[in-house]
């Protein structure tokens, strides 16, 4: 991967539209800045005045709700990590296995609820909206927990577990069926010794559009695929107009999303990172608050005594 470059917002969708897996640390080149502040009081002063807040969220937010991340040493489904299965090639080679993986993830979400971090974001959006201020969430997560918490201004740049896309006619549809098809009932167990179900392709989820019946796939962005240009245009607009940015629970290593916050910081907008650890981008930002997002976000986004009302 080439060195990180700062580009005008209008060029992001042209240069960094393909989802790429994490690069090695030595290939992540970040400009060094002063150590970020951890002063909540200073952050809160900026928060009280901000008119247009962008919150970018990643897997770390949902991990606190018990959602598997499929990353790191223990992040396996059977013997595979997400980047082994979340590819067009994997689906073409073994659609049954890929559907088992996503069926498991869909079923797991039935028992998961938004945590304090999700709720703090949703409450902040509602409260500030009544003051004529804008809060928008740009999330890499596909679990819909932000939506479940009540977030309205939401850009799900990597898609959703609960949407499907037909590989024949291209129709995208919401799908909350459990199981998504009879053949997947009871399938998808994550334990390493579990054998593939090897479901015949004709019994996998099929399109219900009249006269189609094509094979459905999860409506998520897989590694090697481009993000939706229309969504990227919306992202560009939000990044160009925001006056405060929060980066919440994201590792800042999956592109193109890893590019967004550094680009905002490069034009002088305060960026605050909320994470359980530092990331390759930490020193690009004004603030860094270390700890669980469910602990740090409620304090950061609570009503401020000096909140400006339009």
Swiss-Prot record:
Catalytic activity: N(6)-malonyl-L-lysyl-[protein] + NAD(+) + H2O = 2''-O-malonyl-ADP-D-ribose + nicotinamide + L-lysyl-[protein]; N(6)-succinyl-L-lysyl-[protein] + NAD(+) + H2O = 2''-O-succinyl-ADP-D-ribose + nicotinamide + L-lysyl-[protein]; N(6)-glutaryl-L-lysyl-[protein] + NAD(+) + H2O = 2''-O-glutaryl-ADP-D-ribose + nicotinamide + L-lysyl-[protein]
Pfam (any one): SIR2
Residue sites binding Zn(2+) per the record: 166, 169, 207, 212
Residue range of the transit peptide in the UniProt record, numbered on this chain: 1-36
Positions that bind NAD(+): 58-77, 140-143, 249-251, 275-277, 293
Top EC class for this record: transferase
Active site, per annotation: 158 (proton acceptor)
Single GO MF annotation: protein-succinyllysine desuccinylase activity
InterPro entries linked to this entry: DHS-like_NAD/FAD-binding_dom, NAD-dep_sirtuin_deacylases, Sirtuin, Sirtuin_cat_small_dom_sf, Sirtuin_class_III, Ssirtuin_cat_dom
Keywords: Cytoplasm, Metal-binding, Mitochondrion, NAD, Nucleus, Transferase, Transit peptide, Zinc
Family (UniProt): Belongs to the sirtuin family. Class III subfamily.
Annotated domain remarks: In contrast to class I sirtuins, class III sirtuins have only weak deacetylase activity. Difference in substrate specificity is probably due to a larger hydrophobic pocket with 2 residues (Tyr-102 and Arg-105) that bind to malonylated and succinylated substrates and define the specificity.
Identification of the protein by name: NAD-dependent protein deacylase sirtuin-5, mitochondrial
Organism: Pongo abelii (Sumatran orangutan)
Highest classification ranks of the organism: Eukaryota, Metazoa, Chordata, Craniata, Vertebrata
